């Protein structure tokens, strides 16, 4: 049983972790104007510059794909990523951005799975998210379809879903089904509230965090990331050697 019911631990702060130890930010919203992330090219450049100053060296950007709000496609994301990389060259910012997506768990996602029209991180890890309001009734058939296509299902920020705050058994079921977990670094700064912080700490203590992402949307998140980089639990996660980020 995962230890989320433990008494929430006091957040201990240290000097900022050098993000070069993480290496790769694999969840971000850097492409201008296609979701609720960066809105202008200047925004995109500011986000990349800020993350590089922390030490991140490489990026997988993952725009929302959500049929009701952000109807992005493989082509819009790939083209947007190319535009961003061209801007970085012109701005003499030495880094590379790679195209992925954050798929909302809806009927459109099921259609994309059926067509195998998907952008996975490194061609391997398929990032998806649930609704914050409604627990998915039965995600397991879709998870099995994802695996049958040769992808590894990767759930974005499980610490943020209220229906998991007091039901670690539900996360255990996902884990048993082969789902990887990605933690938002800002959760360790309490950015999403005390319950998300508690679950994030519990996930680290229970060694069930596979990836760390900034999920950055706007420049104000840079200040939050700066605080999160001082978290004792972040040090614990990085020092555990469990993170797959460096291999991306």
Label each region the model flagged.
Residues 52, 147, 204-205:
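Non-catalytic positions within long, well-ordered alpha-helices that form the structural scaffold/packing
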Residues 209-224:
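Short acidic/histidine-rich active-site segments
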Residues 29-31, 64-65, 100-104, 131-133, ...:
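Active-site beta-loop-alpha junctions enriched in small/polar residues
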Residues 8, 226-248:
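Mid-to-C-terminal alpha-helical segments outside catalytic/metal-binding sites
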Residues 12-13, 71-181:
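Extended substrate/RNA-proximal surfaces in nucleic-acid metabolism proteins
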Residues 1-92:
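An N-terminally biased module of ancient metal coordination in phosphate/nucleic-acid-related enzymes
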Residues 2, 13-33, 168-185, 189, ...:
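Mobile, glycine- and charge-enriched loop segments
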